[in-house]
Amino acid sequence: MFKWYVVQVFTAQEKKVKKSLEDFKEASGMSDFIQQIILPSENVMEVKKGEHKIVEKYIWPGYLLVKMHLTDESWSYVKKTQGVVEFLGGGAPVALSEEEVKNILADLEEKKSGVVQKHKFEVGSQVKINDGVFVNFVGVVSEVFHDKGRLSVMVSIFGRETRVDDLEFWQVEEVAPGQESE
C-alpha cells in the first residue's frame, strides 16, 4: 500500500535529490514502489531596487514528501540516495496520516495557485529604516503599496511626527515591540 513519508535531505540539495530519486526510479524499475515525489514550494514575489522578481521558495527547506510502498528494498534505495539524511521517524519510518496528507496537499495547492508577497508589512506595524537619509530611524507604517513594493512610514524627528514616503520594502525591516532602541 502506498503511503506518504517525509524524507530529510541536505539543505540546498532538495532539487538535486528529487531529480536523482525520479531518474533512478525510472531507470531501476522502482516505479512500482515509488509513486510520487514532492518538493513543497511556493512562488514568492520579491522587490529589490524597484524590480519585481518571482522566485521559488521551499516551504520546508531540507524535506521532500515521497509517496511510496515501503519495503526493505524501497527504503534502502531512498536512504542510499546521495543527499538523503533520513526518513522522518529515524530507524522506523513513520507514514503521514491521511488527515495530515490531505491538509498538506490542500495547503500546497493553495500556495501554488498564486504568488505570495515576501514582505507582509501592515499599516501600524513598527519598522526600522536601514537605508537612505533616515537610516536607523524607527517608525510606524502608515501606508503599504504591495503592487509597487513600497511603503510610507511615520517617524518622530525632534518630537514631531514626520512622514517618510516612497521607501522600498528592502529599505526597512520589521521590528518587534520592545526592540525600538536597538
From Swiss-Prot:
SMART domains (alphabetical): KOW, NGN
Protein known as: Transcription termination/antitermination protein NusG
Similarity comment text for this entry: Belongs to the NusG family.
GO biological process: DNA-templated transcription termination; regulation of DNA-templated transcription elongation; transcription antitermination; transcription elongation-coupled chromatin remodeling
Signal peptide start-end: none
Known function: Participates in transcription elongation, termination and antitermination.
UniProt lineage: Bacteria, Pseudomonadati, Chlamydiota, Chlamydiia, Chlamydiales
Domain of life: Bacteria
Gene3D superfamilies in the record: 2.30.30.30, NusG, N-terminal domain (3.30.70.940)
Keyword annotations of the record: Transcription, Transcription antitermination, Transcription regulation, Transcription termination
HAMAP family linked to this entry: NusG (MF_00948)
InterPro entries: KOW, NGN, NGN-like_dom, NGN_dom_sf, NusG-like, Rib_uL2_dom2, Transcrpt_antiterm_NusG, Translation_prot_SH3-like_sf
Listed NCBIfam families: nusG
GO CC aspect terms: cytosol
Source organism (scientific name): Chlamydia muridarum (strain MoPn / Nigg)
